[in-house]
Design a protein with these regions (language model features):
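Soluble "head" domains of membrane/secretory-pathway proteins
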Residues: 1-133
Length: 133
């Protein structure tokens, strides 16, 4: 269970690390279904995953090795999707779940266009509230 704020993305663009609610971009049975994932890559960036480590190359050419202390488990290095490179267009974001080994995300159905974003998650609650960082 989560509480999100729809107004956030009317005024600002998603930022790296945001947990966002968005409509599934892939054609098929999940098209339009709401997903909750973390923003990993921003427009114009390249996302490379090597042995489970996420490496971002920004539009300016800076290399960022993501510190992902929020992950639920260590990503499996043997998964093909954990050893790929993804290039984002001007209006695209790369989304990944925090439960990487069992997450259907941008590694499977591609980048998410800006207009698919619905809300920024602020709180999750299950037997108490937790602020999303």
């Amino acid at each position: 269970r989560m509480i999100g704020l729809r107004m956030t993305y009317y005024f600002t663009d998603p930022k790296r690390g945001d947990v966002a609610i968005f409509k599934c971009p892939a054609e098929g049975p999940d098209y339009g279904k709401l997903y909750v994932k973390r923003v990993i890559g921003l427009p114009g960036e390249t996302v490379t995953i090597k042995a489970g480590q996420v490496i971002i190359t920004t539009a300016d050419g800076e290399t960022i090795y993501l510190d992902e202390s929020y992950l639920n488990e260590t990503p499996r290095e043997d998964l093909t999707v954990n050893n790929q490179t993804y290039i984002l267009g001007d209006d695209e974001y790369f989304m990944m779940g925090d439960n990487r080994n069992n997450s259907t995300d941008s590694r499977f159905w591609g980048n998410v266009k800006r207009d698919r974003f619905v809300a920024k998650v602020l709180f999750k609650y299950w037997k108490g509230f937790e602020i999303i960082k």
